[in-house]
A protein has these predicted regions:
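C-terminal lobe/tail of nucleotide-utilizing enzymes
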Residues: 1-8, 205-228, 238-382
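Generic beta-strand/beta-sheet core signal
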Residues: 17, 45-47, 152-155, 256-260, ...
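Glycine- and acidic
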Residues: 15-17, 119-124, 253-258, 327
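Nucleotide-state-sensitive switch-loop elements of NTP-binding domains
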Residues: 1-15, 22, 27, 31-235, ...
Length: 382
């Protein structure tokens, strides 16, 4: 198994992907910290608003803007005084607003869109928006020239493929024929002129009138008004989407599939890797977190003297020794199970597998993140 050092040296974008609950966010932060330690100007973009993760990076809370990690805290964690590490949480609304302002024909047109209640719902709730905006924000960070590397922690999802599919689903929704019919202006096509245009216009009005009766208000007319105002940006969204797809497939991008050593989770990670390869996304390796490593066997005869030396009362030594031996047996059974999962991953990518053992406590500070990174870079042998 190789370590991640070459990837951290050469990549411009690292995407940590996988199902929820496998340690993606912690892994992304640990990778970003190691990259900063090597001298690269690094930003980590997370979707996880957890205060605990922000605290582990030395921040009070995440914001929608990149925040520079205090240099004194980085020095205390073993980095040089000129190391540069920033972190931010995705703010979907702010990212979408920036796109509208950037691509609208003028300020008045941007304001009409931004103030529309349907846009406000669209920019935060429509399926695929979060994933689309995450990569859009990455593109902005890289284009700023302030960072050598951006690490993207993908949104939590039941299935890791949601991250790859969601932006395309979003654009397909915007291209939907029914949506186009709602917002299409009367003079948008060569056939929509004269009597035909009037007939089509009356048809729309009749449909809207019927739907408004069902919804209790001018819902669809208002929606059509929003879509017509927003339609001028559709091509910009399509263009941005193509640029995003190019970025995700670039030679300087790598996807790290994060998993945990549970059979179902490993199967999904292996399938996700196959889909990455099939779709032309650059696979950078598996990271398997929380792996139980085997411990040497012991006996009550060996434990009792150790308990006595630790000051455990006479009548408690034998029962405690039995409990400790039972716990050791349980641990080694889980280690055997985890070893099977590691073998399954190694069969697929033997040189691209990185293992982080189960740590004695949760990662809650820069030292903990540094320890995770040390395992990924092979500085700590398992």
């Amino acid at each position: 198994m190789k370590n991640l050092a070459p990837l951290l040296r050469d990549a411009r974008l690292i995407v940590t992907a996988g199902t929820g609950g496998v340690g993606k966010t912690t892994t992304a932060a640990a990778i970003a910290l190691q990259a900063a330690k090597s001298g690269r100007r690094t930003a980590v973009l997370t979707i996880d608003p957890a205060r605990r993760l922000a605290n582990s990076l030395g921040l009070t809370a995440f914001t929608g803007r990149a925040q520079r990690i205090d240099s004194q805290q980085l020095v205390a964690a073993g980095l040089s005084s000129d190391a540069q590490l920033s972190a931010m949480m995705l703010d979907m609304r702010a990212t979408a607003d920036d796109m509208v302002r950037r691509h609208a024909s003028d300020e008045a047109a941007a304001d009409r869109i931004l103030e529309n209640p349907y846009y406000q719902a669209f920019s935060t709730s429509l399926a695929g928006t979060q994933e689309y905006m995450a990569v859009e924000q990455v593109a902005d960070l890289l284009a700023s020239g302030l960072y050598d590397l951006v690490v993207l922690d993908t949104p939590p999802a039941t299935h890791a493929l949601d991250f790859l599919d969601a932006p395309e689903r979003l654009l397909n929704a915007l291209d939907n024929r029914a949506v186009n019919w709602l917002y299409r202006p009367k003079d948008s096509g060569p056939r929509e002129s004269g009597y035909g245009a009037r007939l089509l216009g009356r048809g729309r009005q009749m449909v809207f009138k019927s739907l408004n009766k069902l919804t209790g208000g001018p819902f669809f007319e208002d929606l059509a008004t929003f879509l017509q105002a927003f339609s001028s940006l559709f091509e910009e969204f399509r263009s941005s989407s193509r640029a995003v797809q190019t970025l995700l497939r670039a030679d300087s991008t790598r996807f790290l599939v994060v998993t945990a050593p549970y059979p179902a989770t490993v199967r999904e990670a292996i399938y996700f890797r196959s889909q990455l390869v099939e779709r032309g996304f650059p696979f950078g390796g598996f990271i398997c977190n929380r792996v139980h490593l085997p411990r040497p066997p012991s006996t009550a005869g060996g434990l009792v003297p150790a308990l006595a030396a630790a000051g455990v009362a006479d009548d408690m030594r034998a029962p405690l020794a039995r409990d400790l031996l039972a716990a050791l047996d349980d641990h080694n059974r889980m280690a055997e199970r985890d070893a099977g999962s590691i073998r399954d991953l190694a069969e697929v990518a033997p040189d691209e597998l990185h293992v982080v053992p189960l740590l004695p406590e949760d990662v809650h500070d820069l030292d903990g993140l540094s320890r995770v990174g040390d395992y990924l870079l092979g500085r700590i042998q398992r």
